[in-house]
Curated annotation (Swiss-Prot):
Originating species: Saccharomyces cerevisiae (strain ATCC 204508 / S288c) (Baker's yeast)
Predominant cellular place of this UniProt entry's protein: Golgi
Name of this chain's protein: Bud site selection protein 7
Entry keyword set: Golgi apparatus, Membrane, Protein transport, Transport
Leftover remarks: Present with 2070 molecules/cell in log phase SD medium.
GO CC terms in record: exomer complex; membrane; trans-Golgi network transport vesicle
Amino acid sequence: MITQNSIPEVKEDFIGYALHERRIRLPQFQDLGPADLVTLTKYLPTSSNTNAINSTSRNGAAIIQSPAAVVADDSAASMATNGDASDTAVTTNYTNASIYSSSRNANDGAPMVAELHPLDKLKDEVGTFFYSMGVDTSGPTSIAIFLKEISEVISEKPQVWFGRKKTFNVARISFSTWNAFRRCDINVVVHIPGSIQNFIVDCNGESQNIEMCADYDLIWAETFVSGVVRSIMLMKENAEEGELQNLVETLILNPFTAGQIDDVPEMFIDLFPIVYHKGPLLGAPYYITNVTNTNNYLVETLVEIVKLTRNVSRAEIMLKNLATDNPEAIIILIKIFLVCDQELDAIKLTYDMLSQDKIINNTNNRMDYKSELLCLQAQFLIDKRQDYSLAQNIAQEAVNCSPSEFRPWYLLSKVYVKLNDIENALLILNSCPMSPLKEKYVLKRVAPLPSNNSLHLPLPIDVVLDEVTSLNPQDVQNEHRSADPMLVNLAASNLKSTFQLAYRLLTEIVQITGWENLLKYRSNIFVMEEEYQKSSSSLPKDVNKQEEQPLRAKRLCERWLDNLFMLLYEDLKMYTLWQTEQLYMDAQNNNHNKLTFEWELFGLCARRLGHFPEAAKAFQNGLSQRFSSRCARKLLEYCINERQRVKNFINSPNSHDMVPEIVSSRIRELDNSIIDLCVKICCWNHRWYTEFSISLLDCLSVVIQDMSLTKVSNEISSRYPETVLNLVQENLLNFFTTCTIGCYDA
């Protein structure tokens, strides 16, 4: 439920500032594009303002005229104050004022202002904006419903605006969303009271009425799909970072439950064939070099939606129909079967596609598709069957098919690690094609903040959980400044994209070999600096050729891998120091006098090195002092993995030695921890205007699978206030009731 306190806003210097900034940056948008933009024009209701609004609504032609046909009124200028010198709303004189730089004056923004708003100015009007994700963008009606809800929330009661209560009405509200397939902005403007205006703005800044387009329905289908892909990929791509995003003025809604008209997951599945061939236009995850029809953000989103909703049958029918003309689409179905625990079906389909090579022969990117199938096979053998010898052969074939792709090389190196073939693992890792310039999908600020005092970040008071919502950001900042610099400056924590994955492999290797032996392996297979300098100097004519042979057999270590060795050394050094200190403190029965932020950093360091129990203990120590969202998320991840480990052990041959009561007690303990952590993270997300989290849905589904929805709801009800239960019900539990086609027991 959206309230005044759940809407972050940025105050504009002049009406239309954010829209103008977005328009001039349209050519710079890449792949999935930016978050949606919502702009509002608010005013304090007076008799003159009411008359002006009513007059404008009667003259509808002035409102809905084509944006390109409107000419800016350069003489318009006004300054209004809402009774507080620090809260001054300025409609800038377009001929004199400049924004941020002398090269760009406010006259640039005048056309946009005139296009989206009537020329009559209201007294005491304020322009604000915020970003949004997850809104149903399937058509102008669904967007208008959302905008109307926002305007009613703002107007229903006095708003606490920069410390003062003010009764605002909304005169105009607009919504801009990026159609990633056509690289254009779709704009919907609602005039209150009045009409709805919707049009396209292309990368050249030219506007066109959508209703005049011959492919009207296709444009809205693409816009809807673009919005859903952005919402899902924002969470999935940043899962390792805890789904964090730094654009604080963003309202993130659940795209599955925010549908105003139709069922969003089902609509996405049904529309998928329409945009299938355009999927590569959206881009692909950071580890993919060659973007294909089956390896892109569109496909990743479909797989994630089916995994969450368990609507496998609908997706299977759709993909098999699609595969009639596009046989490679079966690869997507195989991915869905694998993530939805239908492994036998996935294996059979994979075998059929590889054995009937003619299916792949008739498609473009044949080797890429074959490599993708082989990678799926290898991943399955590594994770599920632990058949590393067979996985090694398959991964090698995948490398031969796509030598420029990172994933086949990564899987091959991982297999060698599992086989304890360290030399080959390092050689293959050194050969991995890295993508240093490709980043994960993150939100970026389109309209710069006009000033430090322009952010309006209300505290959601509808849900209060003291240990979470009462956390003082200033105290956290003080902790960050006081933390151990050696911990804070560990560079491995800043690794991105494929380097993050490569470092993970290196830590797996060092767990097997130890640091000293790893250095020996390194010197055996890579040319060390001293050897290189010696070989580059002039050699005597009578040098023994046999002495040159060992050096010739060695490889040059890539600079990025050399750097990872250094980062690994720093992590190991810090981990050893902390472990030694903890052992000493435990022996002395002394308390560990550490900050929560320091426990968090140490936990992350231990986690990077693969010491998961030690990492979990550090996160628990941090949470015992105050709430930390990162500690909570990483501890939640540990609880899920530990729960799965216990379940796997029960099904293993050695499980007969374990007492069933002990196993049940451990599972129950982990379930309680998972529920508590999910609730607290949900409250924290709500505090920062985020009502959607894939990781929380994933984690809670594990518990609901065993306990049922009703029991989980009762557990939350018995431990937390009703407002907290209602929040969790709305943001998490309702999803399992309405979007999972009855896969979870009520």
